[in-house]
């Protein structure tokens, strides 16, 4: 029965109750149909397959497709992606199996991709190269450089690969390139100039440097920098919104005070805006990324991320050539921090990056000059330094710099100032390993010995000595190793010498140091240096280890002779089992078809030959084998071999890390890149663990529930911290004062109190008298003076300058009922603020004296429980009214009263009764209405979803750091320093000011009632409608209005 017939039988069984089976169906087939129908369901006449989802109780229903033509069309639609791209086999099957299902779906996807010509052409291009000549051509090696002149033609013929691989390579077809020029039918040719963009940027940059046509001045750290507003707004959304909000779009010149910004991080961004080249010190990459994120410069952030990806994917090596020192001591590493060396050259890397479309080059500058071999276009091969016999410490060798990323810009590594270096914790990134077993302390310079030994030994001889012949069996030592170990066989001939010698060879001393930023590269480097083993050898080795574990103690001589019966005749290895011995013999029988044309080594696989040829491309030859023999002799005298401790030092901050992976994670702090991003909200994180914790917050289900109370939590750690409240046991203790905390966040906040704060606040605001400890606090404070509000509520579109104010406001939308203090009546929308209020600021807890929270007015005797209400009331007595109406000039003591007053001009009534739909001007009037007529529907809190009237907390007249200059005002500015202020004056305002000036001459001043206030409003509205001033001038008694505050929300 085919798949279509079986699906039709299941469909008939589920839909036809009278005759569920076809006539003539056997009993065994009926049982199979009933069993299979348990996984299917029919909805709307269509058969669906129910598949169980992992970690979920529901089933995923997939439509079963019965028609072959429809199946072919669905596979084709899933294989083609957006833009005409072709998906892989796994992607096609994964997208298709989300909605549809039928038996053999994966096989049909495989067959379709095999018939796709574009996918097969892509597969041919990605086919690995197995021919040695093609590998040499790809790596840029010359065949004549490694061959001897007296070799015969028969030997040269052996270097080529088998004829089967040659025939496959001959079938490869070159991909032709087509250039298309689109020409309209009317004869209009559209072409673009690739040099136009750079030419325009060059002219703009020259105009900026020569102060031509500049219309904005940037004040940063007391210095002025000229620029163009159009260029700044095109590169940064921050400046664009600033110019639009301050009305500096159409004005001639504007001055922007950038207090809190640093020149070291801002000037590279300014240069990038005019040259599209980002040049900065690698140490300040984090500051540049943070400032670019603040200014909303997405291109700079992409460049910083691409730099980090280049270091991760391409394994970029920061190469620094200098003096290499070896240290041997019995003491700890901390004892050598004080030991210094003669002053040398300190290497500081400066990275220069161009745009993403620019050509990528990595230029290696050694002491300001290029190596001779690189200038000639050939890889440099330097002789290996020869370590002294007394020196036991070693430095990891420098790996060859890989090919740069094709999408990155120009990167150059340069050297700068001269500073002394430390013996162990050096700032240039060189990692030294110290043997603690040796009693003497030796400090040597490998660069001096390099000049002595480099002239005697050629790179080819060193490469031939260091690389043993792989044609021999792994059990037998090579010829080169025999010649090297003849002097040491008499003193110590144990099998442990070879392993210890290989460890010393892996940690051989080379000139230079490196920082490899890739996960797990240290282990891969050790595996690559070891002898490559095939799959058969690895299986045989596992069998040998298993046999040694299960090997029983010797009982008699007969059993021991039987165990040693399986012995290899070629390499001498002994196997306890016959199967392991047979698998081992297959290794010797298999032919080595791949031969290196440079050193005559033979390999069993093409991948092994490729890895071997890469070693020839290294610029520095490996350490000579003579250093290994001397180190073996020195170690042979001691009975115990000390273990080498390796540490990795950050060249930027000098921090010492135990693992290479820890250094890679540590470098994320210096680069400022957060590689892990949330797909829901877009928030980025440095660590993957932080992203997982953040993603759990988006999940609506709280899996972990407390057994003692009703609360549930998203993470297990939150549940454990909550359980500590019930049990009273806490695992977070302060090491300084011994205080315990239930949560780790509380401990981290507590530890900041023990940190000494600087005595002087180094960052001062130029607009007010406030000062701050950090620059980021000053930048955020400047948002209030500049009027920038980057934090916007997604519910009511209300904007804030401070993030904490925005967060508190967003919480008010999600909380149905606020947290209210039972004593003072203060309300909080955040539980943390409410708990802090109850714990610290109120009501005599923890031995405090009970505070009198009621504040009494000295003039009228009125009592207040909230401080802001008391201050507002005192402003009314003292006559401080910072909130002034721009329409009629009436001033108020608080913003709420001004909003209520402005709504009398506009006629807006935003507070609508949800029962009878009557609108009111404020929340107090609406609450009175609902209390009188709809007593059962009185809410706890009345808030507006979107408040159209937003005033500053300190008044409507606020000083701004952006000053608008006109052509007439520039002459006045040159005469002397004056404060500039912009005032918008209309015809209606002038008439109101004249009326106010006329009434101020009256000696008697009295307080207006609500009826008098409405007369003032009617006067302003009458002026707007064109009535005369004399009709209502008599109704005006005074303009000084004093109204008690009536809060909108209770």
From Swiss-Prot:
<keyword id="KW-0805">Transcription regulation</keyword>
<feature type="zinc finger region" description="C2H2-type 12">
    <location>
        <begin position="911"/>
        <end position="934"/>
    </location>
</feature>
<dbReference type="InterPro" id="IPR036236">
    <property type="entry name" value="Znf_C2H2_sf"/>
</dbReference>
<dbReference type="InterPro" id="IPR013087">
    <property type="entry name" value="Znf_C2H2_type"/>
</dbReference>
<dbReference type="Pfam" id="PF17921">
    <property type="entry name" value="Integrase_H2C2"/>
</dbReference>
<feature type="region of interest" description="Disordered">
    <location>
        <begin position="543"/>
        <end position="563"/>
    </location>
</feature>
<feature type="zinc finger region" description="C2H2-type 7">
    <location>
        <begin position="763"/>
        <end position="785"/>
    </location>
</feature>
<feature type="zinc finger region" description="C2H2-type 2">
    <location>
        <begin position="594"/>
        <end position="616"/>
    </location>
</feature>
<dbReference type="InterPro" id="IPR011333">
    <property type="entry name" value="SKP1/BTB/POZ_sf"/>
</dbReference>
<protein>
    <recommendedName>
        <fullName>Zinc finger and BTB domain-containing protein 11</fullName>
    </recommendedName>
</protein>
<dbReference type="GO" id="GO:0005634">
    <property type="term" value="C:nucleus"/>
</dbReference>
<feature type="domain" description="BTB">
    <location>
        <begin position="214"/>
        <end position="282"/>
    </location>
</feature>
<feature type="zinc finger region" description="C2H2-type 6">
    <location>
        <begin position="732"/>
        <end position="754"/>
    </location>
</feature>
<feature type="zinc finger region" description="C2H2-type 8">
    <location>
        <begin position="791"/>
        <end position="813"/>
    </location>
</feature>
<dbReference type="InterPro" id="IPR041588">
    <property type="entry name" value="Integrase_H2C2"/>
</dbReference>
<dbReference type="GO" id="GO:0003677">
    <property type="term" value="F:DNA binding"/>
</dbReference>
<dbReference type="Pfam" id="PF00651">
    <property type="entry name" value="BTB"/>
</dbReference>
<feature type="zinc finger region" description="C2H2-type 4">
    <location>
        <begin position="676"/>
        <end position="698"/>
    </location>
</feature>
<keyword id="KW-0677">Repeat</keyword>
<feature type="compositionally biased region" description="Low complexity">
    <location>
        <begin position="378"/>
        <end position="399"/>
    </location>
</feature>
<dbReference type="GO" id="GO:0008270">
    <property type="term" value="F:zinc ion binding"/>
</dbReference>
<dbReference type="Pfam" id="PF00096">
    <property type="entry name" value="zf-C2H2"/>
</dbReference>
<feature type="compositionally biased region" description="Low complexity">
    <location>
        <begin position="623"/>
        <end position="638"/>
    </location>
</feature>
<feature type="zinc finger region" description="C2H2-type 11">
    <location>
        <begin position="883"/>
        <end position="905"/>
    </location>
</feature>
<dbReference type="InterPro" id="IPR000210">
    <property type="entry name" value="BTB/POZ_dom"/>
</dbReference>
<dbReference type="GO" id="GO:0005730">
    <property type="term" value="C:nucleolus"/>
</dbReference>
<feature type="zinc finger region" description="C2H2-type 5">
    <location>
        <begin position="704"/>
        <end position="726"/>
    </location>
</feature>
<dbReference type="Pfam" id="PF13912">
    <property type="entry name" value="zf-C2H2_6"/>
</dbReference>
<feature type="zinc finger region" description="C2H2-type 10">
    <location>
        <begin position="855"/>
        <end position="877"/>
    </location>
</feature>
<comment type="function">
    <text>May be involved in transcriptional regulation.</text>
</comment>
<feature type="compositionally biased region" description="Low complexity">
    <location>
        <begin position="157"/>
        <end position="168"/>
    </location>
</feature>
<feature type="zinc finger region" description="C2H2-type 3">
    <location>
        <begin position="648"/>
        <end position="670"/>
    </location>
</feature>
<feature type="compositionally biased region" description="Basic and acidic residues">
    <location>
        <begin position="553"/>
        <end position="563"/>
    </location>
</feature>
<feature type="compositionally biased region" description="Acidic residues">
    <location>
        <begin position="143"/>
        <end position="156"/>
    </location>
</feature>
<feature type="region of interest" description="Disordered">
    <location>
        <begin position="373"/>
        <end position="514"/>
    </location>
</feature>
<keyword id="KW-0479">Metal-binding</keyword>
<keyword id="KW-0804">Transcription</keyword>
<feature type="region of interest" description="Disordered">
    <location>
        <begin position="143"/>
        <end position="173"/>
    </location>
</feature>
<dbReference type="InterPro" id="IPR048060">
    <property type="entry name" value="ZBTB11_BTB_POZ"/>
</dbReference>
<keyword id="KW-0862">Zinc</keyword>
<keyword id="KW-0238">DNA-binding</keyword>
<keyword id="KW-0539">Nucleus</keyword>
């Amino acid at each position: 029965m085919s798949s279509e017939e079986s699906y039709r039988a299941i469909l008939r069984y589920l839909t036809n109750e009278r005759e569920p089976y076809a006539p003539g169906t056997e009993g065994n087939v009926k049982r199979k149909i009933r069993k299979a129908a348990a996984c299917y369901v029919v909805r709307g006449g269509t058969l669906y397959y129910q598949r169980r989802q992992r970690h979920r109780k529901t089933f995923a229903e997939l439509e079963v497709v019965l028609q072959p033509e429809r199946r072919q069309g669905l596979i084709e639609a899933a294989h083609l992606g957006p833009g005409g791209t072709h998906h892989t086999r796994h992607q096609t099957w994964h997208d298709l199996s989300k909605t549809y299902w039928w038996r053999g779906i994966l096989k049909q996807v495989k067959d379709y991709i095999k018939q796709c010509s574009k996918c097969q052409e892509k597969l041919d291009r990605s086919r690995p190269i197995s021919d040695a000549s093609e590998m040499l051509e790809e790596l840029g090696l010359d065949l004549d450089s490694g061959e001897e002149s007296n070799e015969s033609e028969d030997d040269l013929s052996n270097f080529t690969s088998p004829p089967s691989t040659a025939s496959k390579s001959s079938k490869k077809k070159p991909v032709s390139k087509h250039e298309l020029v689109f020409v309209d039918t009317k004869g209009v040719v559209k072409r673009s100039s690739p040099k136009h963009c750079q030419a325009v940027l060059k002219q703009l940059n020259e105009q900026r440097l020569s102060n031509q046509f500049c219309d904005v001045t940037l004040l940063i750290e007391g210095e002025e920098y000229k620029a163009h507003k159009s260029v700044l707004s095109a590169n940064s959304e921050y400046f664009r919104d600033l110019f639009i909000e301050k009305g500096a779009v159409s004005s001639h010149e504007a001055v922007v005070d950038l207090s809190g910004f640093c020149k070291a991080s801002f000037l590279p961004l300014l240069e990038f805006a005019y040259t599209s080249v980002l040049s900065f010190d690698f140490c300040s990459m984090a500051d540049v990324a943070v400032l670019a994120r603040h200014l909303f410069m997405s291109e700079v952030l992409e460049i910083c991320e691409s730099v980090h990806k280049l270091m991760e994917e391409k394994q970029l090596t920061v190469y620094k050539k200098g003096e290499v020192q070896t240290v041997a001591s019995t003491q700890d590493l901390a004892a050598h921090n004080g030991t210094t060396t003669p002053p040398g050259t300190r290497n500081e890397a400066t990275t220069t990056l161009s745009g993403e479309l620019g050509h990528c080059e990595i230029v290696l500058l050694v002491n300001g000059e290029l190596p001779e071999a690189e200038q000639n276009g050939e890889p440099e091969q330097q002789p290996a330094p020869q370590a002294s016999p007394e020196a036991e410490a070693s430095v990891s060798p420098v790996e060859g710099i890989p090919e740069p990323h094709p999408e990155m810009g120009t990167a150059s590594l340069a050297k700068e100032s001269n500073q002394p270096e430390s013996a162990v914790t050096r700032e240039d990134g060189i990692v030294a390993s110290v043997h603690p077993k040796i009693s003497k302390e030796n400090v040597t310079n490998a660069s001096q010995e390099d000049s002595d030994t480099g002239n005697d030994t050629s790179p080819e001889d060193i490469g031939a000595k260091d690389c043993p012949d792989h044609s021999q069996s792994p059990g037998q030592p090579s010829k080169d190793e025999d010649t090297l170990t003849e002097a040491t066989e008499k003193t110590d001939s144990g099998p442990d010498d070879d392993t210890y010698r290989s460890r010393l060879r892996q940690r051989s001393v080379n000139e230079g140091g490196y920082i490899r930023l890739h996960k797990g590269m240290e282990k891969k480097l050790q595996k690559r240096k070891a002898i490559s083993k095939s799959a058969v050898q690895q299986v045989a080795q596992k069998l040998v280890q298993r046999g040694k574990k299960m090997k029983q103690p010797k009982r008699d001589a007969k059993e021991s002779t039987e165990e040693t019966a399986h012995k290899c005749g070629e390499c001498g290895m002994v196997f306890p089992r016959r199967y392991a011995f047979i698998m081992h013999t297959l290794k010797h029988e298999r032919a080595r078809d791949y031969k290196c044309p440079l050193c005559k080594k033979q390999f069993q696989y093409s991948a092994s030959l490729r890895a071997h040829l890469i070693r020839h491309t290294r610029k520095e030859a490996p350490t000579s084998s003579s250093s290994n023999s001397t180190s073996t002799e020195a170690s042979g005298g001691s009975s115990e071999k000390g273990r080498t401790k390796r540490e990795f030092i950050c060249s930027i901050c000098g921090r010492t890390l135990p693992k290479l992976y820890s250094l890679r994670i540590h470098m994320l702090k210096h680069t400022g890149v957060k590689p892990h991003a949330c797909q829901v909200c877009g928030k980025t994180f440095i660590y993957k663990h932080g992203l997982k914790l953040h993603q759990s917050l988006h999940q609506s289900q709280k899996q972990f529930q407390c057994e003692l109370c009703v609360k549930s939590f998203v993470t297990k750690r939150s549940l454990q911290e909550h359980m500590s409240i019930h049990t009273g046991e806490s695992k977070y203790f302060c090491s300084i004062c011994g205080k315990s905390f239930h949560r780790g966040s509380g401990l981290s906040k507590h530890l900041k109190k023990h940190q000494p704060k600087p005595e002087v606040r180094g960052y001062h605001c130029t607009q007010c008298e406030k000062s701050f400890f950090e620059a980021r606090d000053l930048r955020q404070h400047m948002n209030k003076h500049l009027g920038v509000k980057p934090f916007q509520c997604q519910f009511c579109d209300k904007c804030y300058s401070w993030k904490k104010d925005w967060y508190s406001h967003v919480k008010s939308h999600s909380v149905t009922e606020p947290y209210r203090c039972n004593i003072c009546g203060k309300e909080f929308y955040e539980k943390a603020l409410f708990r802090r209020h109850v714990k610290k600021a109120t009501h005599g807890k923890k031995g405090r004296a009970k505070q009198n929270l009621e504040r009494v007015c000295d003039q009228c005797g009125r009592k207040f429980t909230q401080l802001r209400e008391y201050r507002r009331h005192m402003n009314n007595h003292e006559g401080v009214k910072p909130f002034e109406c721009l329409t009629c000039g009436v001033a108020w003591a608080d913003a709420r009263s001004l909003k209520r007053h402005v709504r009398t001009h506009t006629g807006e009534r935003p507070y609508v009764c949800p029962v009878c739909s009557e609108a009111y001007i404020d929340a107090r009037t609406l609450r009175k209405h609902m209390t009188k007529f709809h007593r059962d529907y009185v809410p706890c809190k009345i808030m507006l979803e979107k408040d159209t009237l937003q005033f500053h907390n300190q008044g409507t007249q606020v000083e701004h750091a952006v000053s608008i200059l006109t052509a007439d005002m520039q002459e006045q500015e040159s005469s002397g320093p004056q404060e500039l202020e912009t005032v918008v004056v209309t015809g209606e305002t002038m008439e109101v000011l004249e009326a106010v000036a006329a009434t101020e001459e009256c000696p008697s001043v009295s307080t207006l009632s609500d009826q008098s206030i409405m007369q003032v409003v009617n006067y302003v509205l009458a002026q707007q409608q064109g009535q005369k001033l004399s009709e209502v001038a008599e109704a005006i008694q005074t303009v000084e209005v004093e109204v008690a505050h009536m809060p909108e929300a209770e």
